[in-house]
Regions:
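N-terminal acidic leader/helix
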Residues: 1-29
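Short, charge-rich amphipathic interface segments used for partner binding and complex assembly
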Residues: 21-60
Length: 60
């Protein structure tokens, strides 16, 4: 499991996982869009071999 800490978030958008088929097989992606307090936009893309690996737990 990988942990990503994001601080000073103004807006957080977590998309549902989507599957993609490539020449090497099926894989899953999930995008996270973050806008911080200074209006800086960051896009994070996660890749995995199965949908369960892309589970996200929000800690508040």
């Amino acid at each position: 499991m990988t942990t990503i800490l994001i601080h000073r978030v103004k807006t957080l958008v977590i998309q549902k996982p989507t599957s993609l088929e490539s020449t090497v097989g099926l894989f899953w992606t999930r995008k996270i869009f973050v806008i911080d307090e200074n209006s800086k936009k960051t896009e994070i893309t996660l890749f995995a071999e199965n949908e369960q690996t892309l589970e996200i737990k929000e800690l508040t």
